[in-house]
C-alpha cells in the first residue's frame, strides 16, 4: 500500500482475526458451492427428473448470479457497510442453501440456486476488502495466504466433497452442510465492530443505468460463454439473445463508467500497471483453475469410466498440496521478490499442466500424482502472490472496487476457458477420429489382429461377433480421440501459462 494505509491495528488483533476467519470461511463456502455439484449432476438429474441439458443449469444459474454480484458488492458494501452487507449475504446464502435442499422441482432449485450464487458472489470480494481494512500493512502476509488458500481449495475439493456426500447420504446434503456454518458466520460478523461506516447518501447518487447495464453485460456474457459451446454459438436463438444483451449492456455500462463523475465501478484502477498486469494474470489462472477442474474429471469419468468417489480420490491431491504448501507462502512473500515468485509459480503450474498433456487411455492415479503436485504448488503461489501485487500499490480508497474487479477477472477467465474447451473439444475429437479411421484399413496389421481377436472372443454371442468387435474398436477409437483432444488442450493451456509468466518482467515489486 501507500501512505494512505495505516501501519497500526485499527481493532484488537483477536477481534480482527475472529472477523476475518468468519469471513474467509463464508468465502470458502461460496467458492466451494461453484464446483460441489460438478461430480453429482447425474444424481441431481435423477432426483429432479430433468434432462441432461436441463440439469447443467444448476451450475450455470449459480455462475451467472455470482458474476453479477461480485462487482456490485463494492457499491452495496459502501452503502450498507461491510459488516451489515456481509451479514446479509451470509444469511441469504444460508437460507437459500436450505431452500435448495428442499426444492420440489428443477425450476424451484434453479431459483434458489440463483439466490445462493448472488449472495455467495457478494461474500467473495467483500472478504478481500475486509482483509485490507482489518490488518495493518506489515501483518497482511498470513491473511493473504489464508485468502488464497481458501480461493483455490474450494474448486479443488468441491467435486470430492460433493461426490462423497452424494454417495454416502444424498445430493441434498451438498446444500444442507452450509446451514450451521452459515448461522455461525452471520452471528460472528454481525456481533463484531463496524469495519467501515455505512453511507446511505450513495443511494441518491447511484448510477442505476450503469447498474442495469453491468448486470446485462455480465449476465449475458456468462450465458453466452456457458451455453454457446453447447448450442453452436449464434446458431441458437437463446445464445444470440444473450449476446445482444451482453453487447447492449456493455455499451451502457462502459460509456457511463467513463463519462459519469461518480461511476458505479471505478475502472481507473486499470491505470495502475501492477493491477492491470495482475488482472490479466489472474484471468489466465482462472482459465487454468476451472479448465483443469473440468477437463480432468471429464477424462476420468468418460475415458477411464471412474465414479464420482474415484474421481474425487484422484483430484484431492491438488487440494491437499495447496492446503499444505500455503502456510509456507506467509514466509515467502515478505522475504522474496514477489515478481520472481509469481514467475516461478506460473512456470511450475504450466510444467504440471504440460506433464498432464501426455494422457493415455490407461492413465490413472499414479500418472496424475506428480503433475498435480507441481500444478497445485504453482497455482497456490500465483493466486496468493498475484493478489498481493495487484492490491499493494493501490490506495485504500480504491481497494473495494479493485477487489471486485480482480475476483471478477478470475471468474471470467474460468468462463472463457470452459467455453473454449467445450467448443474446441468436439471438433478436435472429430479430427482425431477421422485421422485414426483413415489408418483402420486391411493393410494395418494392428487393426486386423485386434479385430480377429475380438471376433474370436465374441463368437459365442452368435453371428454378430464381428459387428460387436467393430463396435468395441470404434468405442476405443472414440476414447483415444477424446484423450488426444484433451492432450492438445492441455498443451495449449500450458503454453498460455508459460507466456503469461513473462508479464512479471513489466511489474513493479510492490510493498512487502
From Swiss-Prot:
One GO BP: response to antibiotic
Loss of function: phenotype: Deletion of the gene significantly slows cell growth in 20% sucrose. The mutant is more susceptible to colistin, nafcillin, paromomycin, spiramycin and D,L-serine hydroxamate than the wild type.
Membrane topology, from the record: Multi-pass membrane protein
GO molecular function, one term: transmembrane transporter activity
Gene Ontology CC: plasma membrane
PANTHER family in alphabetical order: MAJOR FACILITATOR SUPERFAMILY MULTIDRUG TRANSPORTER MFSC (PTHR42718:SF9)
Family listed: Belongs to the major facilitator superfamily. EmrB family.
UniProt-recorded name of the protein: Colistin resistance protein EmrB
Taxonomic source organism: Acinetobacter baumannii (strain ATCC 17978 / DSM 105126 / CIP 53.77 / LMG 1025 / NCDC KC755 / 5377)
Lineage of origin: Bacteria, Pseudomonadati, Pseudomonadota, Gammaproteobacteria, Moraxellales
Encoding gene per record: emrB
